[in-house]
């Protein structure tokens, strides 16, 4: 009951953090029900079959049991003596308990914070980035060179190459591509973890003249973003017409963040000066020649891009029909002259007479976040730093270098981490629930304190263990702390219940009953 009670407050937590708590709560609740069923039904029956009168053990096994019993008796006596000393010096014991509580809370505050630890999931991604407006043929050629490096790397089982699409921006681009790299099973790789392999690949590929290629891990929780590390959106609230102002501030932020020791690999896939062709329609000529403007834009879209026509059934399948010009007829800007549009007199008018393509530069895409024009900035914590420390460093840099009309919002996994607060409130509510249940069980407001006062020592030990192992105070550690509260309360209840029964039976003082409970 106590184990289930400590997880009741987690039902009110929102977001992915709440889901993680709730899943663990369901697991604990079902386990407690199965344990209770076993204790009330199977255990008594098995005890009747398995228990035998005590007989002196003989042989090597008997000597082992005798030695173990002597050792256990000495440990028990030592524990009882410590308990007796603590009872005699109650004031000092309470001061020590208060000191351990303060130290434990202090260690908890200085522990590095993170959301969910990065794990070796058996795969990772790679991103290819060539010069802006590079052709798909150049991207394919570079991808083949990178594949040779992947084939030579130990620990990689297979890989899938997709050229012409950026995984980080989710945009189709001829000068981008990505890999899905599947690693060998964990037991076959040994010490070659995913992080080791990614670092090795990044070192081998960082100075390639053809373009940029780098490896990055997946998000800790599949489906929450496309990459690990931190992810933020810079928002332009100035109302500027173009992206130049936002781009300038994004560069300032990345430059300043790259100098922080907590951060590594800070970048953005946004480019504001990608070579483009601007197709301008001469509306005066359009009306003079009797051409419908809508037909002009529809023809450009269908032949230079693509247009969905219809679908048909054949061979038991549904086939979709798309209209698009052959690649060799849409290579150069002059190829627009090969396309025609019909005017009011049913005459075919070449598009080159009413459309002029001029070279220009501009962004390949623009993002909108909270309805504001935005740029996505990504990065990773440096080695030895947690994601919480990295996000705090980014926030400090943003406050220093960004003007008031450029704001930022966390997104994907970083958004979940930034909104994963409330662990302290959950711990407090868990303790309150345990206290109320014990107060109802013992019909006393004082006895539950003897159970609850054991939890600070347990939390102190847990925080010391996390600190000694140089781990992060993440969601899993917090779930473990809630679980620890329930386990410690359960053990304390057994001791208090036995001591209470001894005291009510008569013949023993409160101190003797407490020592009997400790010895039991």
Residue ranges of model-derived segments:
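Transmembrane alpha-helix boundary/anchor motif
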Residues: 12-16, 37, 41, 45, ...
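Surface-exposed amphipathic alpha-helical segments in non-transmembrane regions
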Residues: 106, 110, 125, 138-164, ...
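Signature of alpha-helical transmembrane segments and their immediate interfacial
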Residues: 62-115, 519
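Membrane-spanning helices that line or support transport/gating and their immediate boundary helices
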Residues: 19, 40-49, 82, 114, ...
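N-terminal membrane-entry
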Residues: 26, 373, 419-433
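Hydrophobic transmembrane alpha-helices and their membrane-interface caps
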Residues: 8, 12, 30, 34, ...
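Transmembrane helices with small-residue packing motifs
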Residues: 11-20, 98-134, 188, 215-216, ...
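Transmembrane alpha-helices and their membrane-interface boundaries in multi-pass membrane transporters
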Residues: 1-12, 19-65, 179, 457, ...
């Amino acid at each position: 009951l106590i184990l289930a009670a400590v997880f009741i407050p987690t039902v009110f937590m929102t977001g992915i953090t709440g889901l993680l708590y709730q899943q663990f709560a369901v697991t604990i609740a079902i386990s407690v029900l199965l344990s209770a069923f076993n204790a009330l039904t199977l255990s008594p029956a098995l005890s009747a079959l398995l228990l035998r009168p005590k007989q002196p053990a003989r042989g090597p096994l008997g000597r082992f049991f005798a030695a173990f019993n002597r050792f256990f008796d000495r440990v028990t006596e030592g524990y009882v003596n410590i308990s007796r000393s603590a009872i005699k010096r109650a004031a000092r014991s309470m001061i020590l308990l208060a000191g351990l509580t303060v130290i434990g809370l202090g260690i908890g505050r200085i522990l590095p914070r993170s959301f969910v630890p990065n794990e070796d999931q058996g795969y990772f991604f790679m991103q290819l980035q060539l010069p802006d407006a590079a052709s798909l043929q150049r991207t394919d050629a570079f991808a083949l060179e990178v594949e040779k490096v992947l084939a030579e790397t130990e620990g990689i089982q297979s890989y899938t190459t997709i050229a012409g699409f950026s995984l980080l921006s989710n945009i189709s681009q001829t000068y981008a591509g990505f890999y899905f790299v599947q690693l060998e099973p964990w037991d076959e790789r040994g010490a070659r973890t995913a992080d080791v392999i990614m670092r090795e690949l990044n070192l081998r590929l960082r100075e390639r003249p053809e373009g940029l290629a780098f490896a990055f891990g997946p998000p800790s929780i599949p489906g929450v973003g496309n990459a690990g590390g931190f992810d933020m959106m810079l928002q332009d609230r100035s109302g500027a017409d173009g992206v130049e102002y936002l781009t300038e501030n994004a560069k300032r932020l990345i430059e300043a963040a790259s100098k922080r020791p907590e951060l590594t690999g800070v970048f953005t896939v946004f480019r504001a000066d990608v070579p483009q062709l601007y197709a301008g329609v001469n509306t005066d000529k359009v009306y003079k020649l009797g051409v419908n403007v809508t037909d002009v834009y529809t023809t450009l879209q269908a032949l230079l891009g693509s247009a969905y026509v219809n679908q048909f059934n054949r061979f038991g399948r549904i086939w979709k029909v798309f209209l698009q010009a052959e690649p060799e007829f849409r290579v150069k800007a002059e190829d627009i002259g090969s396309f025609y549009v019909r005017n009011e007199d049913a005459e075919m008018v070449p598009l080159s007479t009413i459309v002029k393509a001029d070279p220009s530069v501009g962004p390949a895409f623009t993002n909108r976040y909270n309805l504001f024009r935005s740029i996505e900035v990504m990065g990773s914590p440096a080695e030895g730093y947690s994601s919480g420390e990295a996000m705090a460093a980014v926030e400090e840099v943003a406050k220093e270098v960004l003007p008031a009309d450029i704001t930022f919002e966390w997104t994907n996994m970083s958004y979940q981490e930034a909104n994963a607060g409330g662990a302290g409130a959950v711990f407090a509510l868990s303790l309150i629930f345990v206290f109320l249940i014990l107060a109802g069980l013992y019909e006393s407001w004082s006895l539950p304190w003897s159970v609850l006062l054991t939890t600070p020592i347990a939390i102190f030990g847990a925080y010391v263990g996390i600190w000694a192992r140089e781990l992060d105070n993440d969601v899993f550690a917090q779930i473990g702390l809630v679980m620890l509260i329930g386990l410690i309360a359960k053990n304390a209840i057994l001791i208090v219940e036995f001591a209470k029964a001894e005291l009510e039976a008569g013949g023993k003082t409160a101190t003797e009953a407490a020592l009997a409970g400790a010895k039991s």
